[in-house]
């Protein structure tokens, strides 16, 4: 259904990444250090919890420990433009929360129950990762709110303020070798790559907007 694609699939991928990191850390007996240099919110923070230690910049965005589902309702629009919606399913609940159909109370209740289950699971991950480091009540920490890196440190959501180069050199010495694995340039950036600065800026804006949407912000 539309709800399952927009809600469960995203959380499932994020939780899978978290689980795989923890499995590899345990298998290889390695300590995991996470650096949130930009944003570690919502699913990003869930993944960050795979770290034995979490560091961030003072201006990083941290938290948003919650579950969100959003969509639009187009029922009045398709009536105005004379469009007839035709849906054929095997299973009466397959079209749950279809944006072209009226919302049903029972569908909203079902969605809310799923959100509560996922939120509970998210909270358990955070509590397992941060345990006694958390310094505020559940009501405040798990409300879906997000904070700056500096405030997140005060709340116990991260261990300290600092970037990867600084922290790793402090821990392992000035001669430590840091290998960086960067994401390859996206299809959009390659397609819009140009000597025209305005085109490049537009590509960057579109990519940044897409990234923030993934964090649920």
Labelled PLM ranges:
Residues 1-57, 68-217:
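N-terminal organellar transit peptides
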């Amino acid at each position: 259904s539309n709800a399952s694609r927009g809600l469960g699939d995203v959380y499932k991928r994020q939780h899978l990444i978290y689980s795989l990191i923890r499995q590899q850390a345990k298998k290889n007996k390695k300590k995991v250090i996470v650096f949130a240099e930009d944003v570690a919110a919502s699913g990003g923070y869930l993944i960050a919890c795979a770290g034995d230690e979490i560091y961030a910049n003072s201006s990083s965005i941290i938290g948003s420990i919650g579950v969100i589902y959003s969509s639009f309702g187009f029922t009045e629009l398709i009536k105005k433009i004379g469009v007839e919606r035709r849906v054929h399913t095997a299973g009466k609940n397959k079209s749950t929360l279809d944006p072209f159909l009226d919302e049903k109370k029972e569908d909203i209740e079902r969605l809310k129950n799923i959100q509560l289950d996922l939120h509970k699971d998210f909270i358990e991950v955070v509590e397992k990762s941060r345990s006694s480091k958390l310094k505020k009540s559940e009501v405040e920490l798990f409300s879906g709110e997000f904070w700056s890196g500096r405030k997140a440190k005060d709340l116990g959501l991260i261990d300290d303020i600092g970037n990867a180069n600084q922290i790793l050199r402090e821990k392992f010495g000035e001669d430590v070798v840091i290998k960086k694995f960067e994401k390859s340039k996206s299809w959009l950036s390659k397609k819009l790559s140009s000597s025209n600065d305005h085109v490049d800026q537009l590509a960057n804006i579109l990519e940044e907007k897409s990234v923030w949407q993934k964090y649920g912000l």
